[in-house]
Swiss-Prot record:
Top class in the EC scheme: transferase
Cellular component per GO, a single term: cytoplasm
Gene symbol of the encoding locus: rlmH
Positions contributing to S-adenosyl-L-methionine binding: 72, 103, 122-127
Pfam family, one: SPOUT_MTase
Assigned protein family: Belongs to the RNA methyltransferase RlmH family.
Subunit structure, as described in the record: Homodimer.
Alphabetical keyword list: Cytoplasm, Methyltransferase, rRNA processing, S-adenosyl-L-methionine, Transferase
Species annotation: Enterobacter sp. (strain 638)
Enzyme Commission number(s) of this protein: 2.1.1.177
Protein name according to UniProt: Ribosomal RNA large subunit methyltransferase H
Length: 155
């Protein structure tokens, strides 16, 4: 199984790249994890936000292909770390690759939400999307460590 993080936005600050890359390099070779960045639509005073969301969503879904789609969204399920580890195990048993979708400033398109098999809420708080990349990578690495009895996670 391959994990794929599909996120709106490019040219992240150095701290985001450093944090994300740190966890990315820790993943084992039998569970590759990749980042696909989708360019954010141009937003301005008179921007058509629905059109922008739809275009971003179209690009995200194209990147995900036939993968299992999991959206990151405030109304999603708030998995704790052991629950995320269980989900990771289920995904592995399913055999398909998994694409986790992070929307842009206005969130995800309705098409992305409709295509999702699951929705995961990191928090009831609104989080900056660059930070979410790092949190997702760390959370998935921690979940993997639980499933393999790696000493990274301590109860």
């Amino acid at each position: 199984m391959k994990l794929q993080l599909v996120a709106v936005g490019t040219k992240m600050p150095d701290w985001v790249q450093t944090g994300f890359t740190e966890y990315l390099r820790r993943f084992p070779k039998d569970m590759p994890f990749e980042l696909v960045e989708i360019p954010a639509g141009k937003r301005g005073k008179n921007a058509d936000i629905k059109r922008i969301l739809d275009k971003e969503g179209e690009l995200m879904l194209a990147a995900a292909g036939k993968n299992r789609i999991v959206t990151l969204d405030i109304p999603g399920k708030p998995w704790d770390t052991p629950q995320l580890a269980q989900e990771l195990e289920r995904w592995k048993l399913d055999g398909r690759d998994v694409s986790l979708l992070i929307g842009g400033p206005e969130g995800l398109s309705s098409a992305c939400k409709a295509a999702a098999e699951q929705s995961w809420s990191l928090s009831a708080l609104t989080l900056p999307h660059p930070l979410v990349r790092v949190l997702v990578a760390e959370s998935l690495y921690r979940a993997w460590s639980i499933t393999t009895n790696h000493p990274y996670h301590r109860e």
